[in-house]
Each structure stands twice: as structure tokens, then as C-alpha cells.
Amino acid sequence: MTFNGDLLWRHLVIPGVVALMAGTVAAEPPTPRKPIVIDSAVASIDDTANTADFTTISVAQGGARITAETAHATDLGSKNSRWTFTGRVVITADERGSIWADKAIVVYRDGVLDEILATGAPARFERRHTDSARADQGQAEEITYEVKQATVRLRGHPRISTENGLEMNAPMFLYRLRDGRLQAYSDQGTQAVHIITKPTGSLVP
């Protein structure tokens, strides 16, 4: 059976199957107990194929939310589903972490979020350590968030600027969310890690 929704706004609730991202910066995996809440302008759901397409979509669970112009979901309602969001994708968890992208592939395994692959020209992420206005910010052609490892990996002309004033570029960055550690990797045999620091005090006594 195929369902097409052309109302001004569709509101769907899928209980207890998958949990939306507990944060691009969360250290703990999300819980599967809370329902996913889907709002969209247009919804087309194929019960036979177990797929769905959405336009002007917002997907929320708890305090986490993904918004995009369109989305396609496979294995909708199962413990292992895959979502493809396209067009002005914004992934937010709380006041501390966000990802902006042109496209994001979101994978759930065993009822919880497993991985997000965000791409863009560029895709961007932001991580706040405290309630201050400053934040670590990064951009790359590809940003991968792995939930169990609590890591964000940046590839494709990545750049990072930290709340402490460091600006870096390298072939790849690995950002460890649990302890806030940042690792930069260069290609083998090259010196491609570039760091700029901006001292806040005077260098002259």
C-alpha cells in the first residue's frame, strides 16, 4: 500500500524503533525508547517496500532534530533503517553541537543511531565546550560522525578553528568528542598539517 500525503503539514510518530541523534557532540549513544516524530509538507509512504519520501521535513527525538528540504527512508519502522536527507540539511542535538550539510546519510543499527555521513561544499560542524559564545568549528567536503566511537572525522580540504584561537588545515582531522582531543593527519611522507595560532597577549614585555 502506498500512502501519499499532500496536506499542508504531515505529522507522523514512529514509536520506540530508532532514536535520533543525541548530538553531533554527544558522548553517549541515544536511547531507542523515545519515538521519532516526523513533520513534513508532503509524505509518500510505501508499506510494501517499507520506504518513504518526504518534502520539507523535520525529524525529532527528544531534544535532537534533523531538518532538510527532502528525505528518503528505507526500512522505515525497523531497527535498522537508513535515511538520506538532501537540501539545506541541519542536524542539531542541543545548544552545543550542530552540523550543516547539502546531504546527509543517517544510519541506524539495532534501534540506535550508528553513523552520520554529511557532505557539502563544504559541510560544517560546530562544537561548544561551555556556555560561552566561542566554539570549535570545522568544515570539509565530508564529515563523518560515528556514535559508538564518539568521533567526528573530516576529509576533503578540511579546516578547523578552535575556541582557543588555533586555525588548522590538514588532509584529515579526527575530533574525539569524549575528551575534546583533536588529531590531524597528513599524507605519508608529507608535512601537510598547517597550524596558525593567534596569541592574545603582547609578545613585547
Question: Predicted segments — roles?
Answer:
Residues 1-205:
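Mature-chain termini and adjacent capping regions
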